[in-house]
Regions:
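Interdomain "pre-motor" coupling segment immediately N-terminal to P-loop NTPase/helicase cores
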Residues: 1-12
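Conserved helicase motor core of SF1/SF2 NTP-dependent helicases
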Residues: 16-28, 34-57, 61-119, 124-178
């Protein structure tokens, strides 16, 4: 029997059980990105990090794997943009040190104490409004913020808010990975 990579390239959102049992692997590139981000976070305890890729290339898996590692000792916040709502409820129930928020919760400040988290992770960051991004960039001055998004050329015109993407790319000191 040949090895079938597609059996191990999973989405934590659609297959939370397999994710929680660690029935997946990261590619060499994903492991390298994760290593660089975690090394910098351990050294500086702050910073902006942004990785992009084509849809289906494991960005969400990488982001969740980083969240799992960072949440070993401290609470982290995972912000979901878009329609990921119901899927992450299973993960939310199981991962006690990972708090899940929808983007609109950040905008309204609805009972959120962002300072309670040691790191902020943002999935589908290309869907962020410029207002929410500004709030997250301010938070990033005192703790790490990790953004994951689709490549610019893969974002539909309805989803693309160039203001937010441009603002993110212009952040001094942001580490980007493609």
């Amino acid at each position: 029997d040949l090895f079938q990579a597609e059996l191990y390239l999973i989405s934590p959102l659609t297959e939370p059980g397999r994710f929680l049992k660690k029935e997946y692997f990261l590619t060499y590139q994903q492991r390298d990105i994760e290593r660089q981000i975690l090394k910098k976070i351990r050294a500086d305890r702050t910073g902006y990090f942004w990785f992009t890729g084509l849809p289906g290339t494991g960005k969400t898996l990488l982001l969740y794997d980083i969240a799992m590692k960072l949440s070993g000792r401290q609470r982290v916040c995972m912000i979901h943009c878009g329609e990921a709502g119901k899927e992450w409820k299973v993960l939310h129930e199981r991962l006690r040190r990972v708090e899940y928020l929808a983007e609109d919760s950040v905008q309204t400040g609805a009972e959120i104490r962002i300072e309670a988290y040691s790191a902020i992770l943002v999935d589908e960051a290309h869907l962020l409004s410029p207002n929410t991004l500004e709030i997250l960039l301010e938070i990033g001055k005192t703790r790490p913020v990790i953004f994951s998004s689709n490549c610019e050329d893969m974002i539909s015109p309805e989803e693309l808010d160039l203001g937010a993407i441009k603002l993110l790319g212009e952040q001094p000191g942001i580490q980007t990975f493609h």
